[in-house]
């Protein structure tokens, strides 16, 4: 791994992050005020696949911006933009240019086969939301979770996930599982880190030293929930055009994403 950027480069990056969040927050507030996806009638699908980001409320360890929880917005919108470019170039999937942001309680969620949530160590699902997510998954939906790290955040994730599936275990996805071979042969298991961790000379955050690919399956062996624990694929997509982020890790993050998409669309 290359050495971390100099202090000036770090300061420049964090200044950019601050400016970026101000722009993102303004865009999200405008969407909410306009009732687009988060308030009024959500937009209908225009393609066979859309990137759908799950809106959720933070739990005890969450953050907020002017009253709006914001853990769920991490890496938005650059992650979506680069995800779209990657899937478009690497597959023949008809992917919509416009990503979606939906509450799990929105009926429109059933129009989309693939759902993404980030920083789920901070989320909190009430009983209504948990029941709706269970229904979505039981009816064939696919749920990818990403960018949460360490013991405390794992416990936060499991607390809400057990409301969704109190009767289904979370297990390690085996190397022979179809999801790792449906398009790309994903035999390489390396930790895909966030850029902030890389800048500090590590590939992990908190005490999340070991990466895990875990999942929840239905009664027929279909993977319903893909759990990327102690990893940050969203950062790898977001920084795909940043020379400071290692290209091999970006490439691997894209391959995992493409396999998840193809699996979701065919199972």
Which residues does each PLM region occupy?
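Short alpha-beta junction capping motif
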Residues: 51, 109, 114-154
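Surface-exposed patches in mature extracellular/periplasmic domains of secreted proteins
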Residues: 93-103, 145-148, 168-176
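Stable alpha-helical elements in mature extracytoplasmic
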Residues: 79, 83, 129-132, 153, ...
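Aromatic-Pro/Gly-enriched surface loop or interdomain linker
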Residues: 35-114, 118-121, 224, 232-267
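Bacterial N-terminal signal peptides
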Residues: 22-33
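An acidic, glycine-rich "communication" segment
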Residues: 59-67, 153-234, 238-239, 249, ...
